[in-house]
Amino acid sequence: MTITELQHQYAGHPNVEALNKLLGEPAVRHIYCGGLYASAASLFASALVEKSPCPFVFILGDLEEAGYFYHDLTQVLGTERILFFPSSFRRSVKYGQKDAANEILRTEVLSRLQKGEEGLCIVTYPDALAEKVVSRQELSENTLKLHVGERVDTG
């Protein structure tokens, strides 16, 4: 059985339809799904994402779990809409070792959210959400847009 066949099987499941309908209700803002193990969670999530233009935020238990979930989602849906929002720290916040690559990933997620792109899927974990981020206004005021071939004075 291929990934596409599995995805179609999950997409037709009555629980996906029921949850999709529930997500359409304005009063519902947060949903916890339990009982989905291994790659079943990402297949279920991909079926939901395919049916809705709204952004989704999937909060997993820790970095490792989020990494596996992110990988599974990208295998099913591709990498264009799936974003990973990691902690900006290499190890734990208490050690204070920033990771430049993770800071770039965080900035990309915030930037694409600010643009209002439809159908985004953000995968993260509690440690990453605990960090402060700049406000939308501050990000907008401090964003410098450059074009290919443009000269910039760094002095």
Summary of predicted features, one role per range:
Residues M1-G155:
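ASCE RecA-like P-loop NTPase motor cores
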